[in-house]
Structures are given as structure tokens and as C-alpha cells.
């Protein structure tokens, strides 16, 4: 059956702010406590979705999570009415209020790991929400993520939505940001590629400055629960030196699609062995791996981190050609811009480069790839997604007007203490569930 890769982007939430919560994420730390523009952030992401949908790519949207999370704040000991909880947290522990208010669920590459039905033992699409246990503000996401995915992908004949792995350092799981898939065609069996930063029970190199968030054990557990064939599953370790340089997920240093791996020469430990293993595995699936390795002499790791060259989307057109979707920061870095010009002019599979303004997300360390969750669906599976989440002219207009109606154009750290922000967010999300036809998705609606 024909299949297509759909990208489900996270809609930026009304509490988008710069709290500097993500140690190891250079952009997040550099922009700590600056004022954010939630309205601009949401519109920038929505415009990317619309342009890609207009180009013929399957484009869906995932709703924001409810923030601030009163559930977290109450769990942490703040009591009283909702406004009292926020006021107490703001006075006694503003860092916890910031964690409870983060809009980080917008980066849906961390929402889950997804295996298409062509790869799984039971012929269903499998989702495992990421536990994101390395960061408090993200560790609170997985239950709502599971609820959202279970709502959109509800038919058990086609979909299996698992619980997140147990939230312990040994099973630290950051989702699809450390996972990609190679195949001859989307609907045919492929190779699933899991990248980890460290192993809990194996000796090996580890970063010294910043934490490795993904473990080998978590990647292997996801592969096992999805029923992936052992010979079609490849594991690789990310080079700890690039983690220490700010590459906190593999999608900051590599991106793959179909038969192509676009990567930096310093991305992996024992890279040639990894290339050889991927090549042999993909050859058995009827395709030849094409590695586009960017040399450090052309684009340094620092260039990659500041421009987010590899935090790009690599998309296949109907004619088989590929397009690279990059943030505008790539055009503002001379080395990266020169490399992209050379890449597009060459004879390789990447023929076009699309540039987007995602400045608000980028200042928190999230580029095009962070904002999307890839889900390969065949025709029957796509038909089973009955919510109004596919971007078209009508939905775009509704969401654009919804953002104009409900979002602030400035949100500074001190604004998180405003109890009106909670009311504004809940009003907005209540209306959004009607637009997307997802029912009573949020705790406050139940």
C-alpha cells in the first residue's frame, strides 16, 4: 500500500518564554530571561506548516499542552486557589513556576519515537512518548503527549500508543530527535536508526561538560516494544565531544530521510563502522545508503550549533528529489551559506533549500526539525486520523485568527506570575479543541 511521511508540527503555546531551562542547549542558555513574543512564535511555526502543505507535503498539527501546569505546582507543595498557587510559586520558587510554564512541548521531535507499520511485527504504527526525564520542564509532558497521540491515532487496528518508559536516568529517552529511518520507499520495510549519548550498563566514552540525555538502554527498549526486526535496527553513539559543544540531540548534527544521511563528520563514535552497518542493512532492504558528510573544515561544529544546519527537515518530493528546510540563521552564517549553495548546485539528492524565519523558536534552541514529529502513514492509516489536524487553507485561516485573538506579543519572565495568563491560556486551548475536533483534551476541561 502506498505510504507518505507526514510531519506533525507542534503549535507554539501561549506561554512561550525564555527561561533558560535547558542546560546543554546553548541557545536556551544564551537567551535566558529575555522577553519572548508568543504570537510571533506561533505564527512563524504555522507559516512553515502552511508553506510545506502548499508544496504537497502531508502536514499535520499537534496542539500545545496546558501551561502553566498547576498539577506540577500543586505536586511541589503550592496550595490554594489557582491564582494563589501561581503567586506562591512566583514568590518562593520562580524557577519552578518557569518550569511549569514552559511551552517546550512545541518541539514535537521530542514527543515520541514512531515506527511505521511496515517495520513493526504486528503491522501497526507504534508510538512511544518520550519520558524526557533529564529536564523537569519536559518530564511533565509525556502523559499529555500520550493523551494527544491516543486521541489523534485512536484506532487500535492501525495504531499502538504506549506509555513512556520509566523516568529514570538509565532509561533517559528524548524521542525522535535521536531516531531516524532509512528506506527505499516509505511504505516498504526500512531500517530504524537509534542514536544514544551514553550507555548505563556498558563502558564507553561520555561527555564531560553537558549531560548525555539519551541512553542506549532506552533506545533498545523502544525498538523491542515496537517489535522491530533485529537485523533492521541499528544503534550508534553520538560523539561525546559534540554533546559538550552543544549538540544535545542528534538532530542538531544529523538528519536522515529515505536513502540519505546528511551529517557532520564529527557526529558519531566509530563513524565508518556505522556507515558500513547502515549500508549493509539498507542494501538488504533494496536501497543504497547515500551519506552526505559535511567536513569540519567547511562547517565547524560551532557553525552547526549556531546555525542549526542539521536541525533541518529533509523531505522527499513526489519525483524523488529532496528538499532541505533550514532556519534563516543558516543564511546568516557565511560558512553554512556557502556550503548550502554548493550543496544545491551539486549532483546529489538535495536539489533545493527552503529557508524559514523561526527566530522565536531558534532562540530557545529549536529549529525546523525540532518542531516536527515524523509519522509514516499508508492510505488506510491516514484515513483513520479523523481529527481536524491536517493543514489546509481553512484550518490555517482558523488557527491564524485564533492566534491573533488569544496570544500576547510580549512575555517577559516576570509575566509568568500574572494569574491572567492562566485564564488566557485555558480560554485559548478550550477554543482550540473545538477547532481541531479533539474533544476534552485538557485536565481543566474534565
UniProtKB/Swiss-Prot annotation:
An example Gene Ontology biological process: arginine catabolic process to glutamate
Catalysed reactions, as listed in the record: N(2)-succinyl-L-arginine + 2 H2O + 2 H(+) = N(2)-succinyl-L-ornithine + 2 NH4(+) + CO2
Active site: residue positions: 174, 249, 370
GO molecular function: N-succinylarginine dihydrolase activity
Entry keyword set: Arginine metabolism, Hydrolase
Amino-acid positions noted as binding substrate in the UniProt annotation, renumbered to this chain: 19-28, 110, 137-138, 213, 251, 364
Cited Pfam families: AstB
The protein's Enzyme Commission number: 3.5.3.23
Record-linked NCBIfam families: arg_catab_astB, PRK13281.1
PANTHER family: N-SUCCINYLARGININE DIHYDROLASE
Family as reported in the entry's similarity comment: Belongs to the succinylarginine dihydrolase family.
Function: Catalyzes the hydrolysis of N(2)-succinylarginine into N(2)-succinylornithine, ammonia and CO(2).
Oligomeric form and interacting partners: Homodimer.
Name used for this protein in its record: N-succinylarginine dihydrolase
This protein's encoding gene: astB
Amino acid at each position: 500500500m502506498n505510504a507518505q511521511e507526514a510531519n506533525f508540527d507542534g503549535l507554539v503555546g501561549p506561554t512561550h518564554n525564555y527561561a533558560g531551562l535547558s542546560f546543554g542547549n546553548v541557545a536556551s542558555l544564551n537567551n535566558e530571561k529575555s522577553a519572548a513574543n508568543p504570537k510571533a512564535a506561533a505564527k512563524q511555526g504555522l507559516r512553515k506548516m502552511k508553506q510545506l502543505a502548499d508544496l504537497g507535503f502531508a502536514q499535520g498539527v499537534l496542539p500545545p499542552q496546558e501551561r502553566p501546569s498547576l498539577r506540577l505546582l500543586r505536586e511541589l507543595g503550592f496550595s490554594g486557589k489557582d491564582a494563589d498557587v501561581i503567586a506562591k510559586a512566583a514568590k518562593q520558587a520562580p524557577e519552578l513556576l518557569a518550569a511549569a510554564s514552559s511551552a517546550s512541548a512545541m518541539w514535537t521531535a521530542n514527543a515520541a519515537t514512531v515506527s511505521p507499520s511496515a517495520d513493526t511485527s504486528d503491522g501497526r504504527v507504534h508510538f512511544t512518548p518520550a519520558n524526557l526525564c533529564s529536564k523537569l520542564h519536559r518530564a511533565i509532558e509525556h502523559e499529555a503527549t500520550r493523551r494527544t497521540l491516543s486521541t489523534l491515532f485512536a484506532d487500535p487496528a492501525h495504531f499502538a500508543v504506549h506509555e513512556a518508559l520509566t523516568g529514570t536516568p538509565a532509561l533517559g529517552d528524548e524521542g525522535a530527535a535521536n531516531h531516524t529511518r532509512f528506506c527505499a520507499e516509505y511504505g516498504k520495510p526500512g531500517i530504524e536508526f537509534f542514536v544514544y549519548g551514553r550507555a548505563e550498563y556498558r563502558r564507553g566514552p561520555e561527555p564531560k561538560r553537558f549531560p548525555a540525555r539519551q541512553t542506549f538502554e532506552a533506545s533498545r527498549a523502544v525498538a523491542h516494544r515496537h517489535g522491530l526486526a533485529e537485523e533492521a535496527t541499528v544503534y550508534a553513539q553520538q560523539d561525546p565531544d559534540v554533546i559538550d559543544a552543544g549538540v544535545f540531540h542528534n538532530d542538531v548534527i544529523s538528519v536522515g530521510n529515505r536513502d540519505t544521511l546528511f551529517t557532520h563528520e564529527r557526529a558519531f563514535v566509530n563513524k565508518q563502522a556505522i556507515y558500513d552497518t547502515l549500508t549493509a542493512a539498507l542494501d538488504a532492504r533494496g536501497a543504497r545508503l547515500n551519506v552526505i558528510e559535511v567536513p569540519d573544515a567547511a562547517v565547524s561544529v560551532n557553525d552547526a550549533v549556531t546555525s542549526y544546519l542539521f536541525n533541518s527537515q529533509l523531505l522527499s518530493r513526489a519525483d524523488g528529489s529532496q528538499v532541505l528546510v533550514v532556519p534563516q540563521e543558516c543564511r546568516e552564517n557565511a560558512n553554512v551559506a556557502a556550503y548550502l549553495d554548493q550543496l544545491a548546485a551539486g549532483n546529489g539528492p538535495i536539489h533545493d533549500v527552503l529557508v524559514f524565519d523561526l527566530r522565536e523558536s531558534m532562540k530557545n534552541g529549536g529549529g525546523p526539525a525540532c518542531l516536527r514529529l515524523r509519522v509514516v502513514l499508508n492510505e488506510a492509516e491516514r484515513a483513520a486520523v479523523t481529527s481536524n489536524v491536517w493543514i489546509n487553507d481553512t484550518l490555517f485561516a482558523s488557527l491564524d485568527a485564533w492566534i491573533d485573538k488569544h496570544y500576547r506579543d510580549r512575555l517577559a519572565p516576570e509575566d509568568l506570575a500574572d494569574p491572567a495568563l492562566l485564564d488566557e491560556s485555558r480560554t485559548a486551548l478550550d477554543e482550540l479543541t473545538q477547532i481541531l475536533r479533539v474533544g476534552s483534551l485538557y485536565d481543566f476541561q474534565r
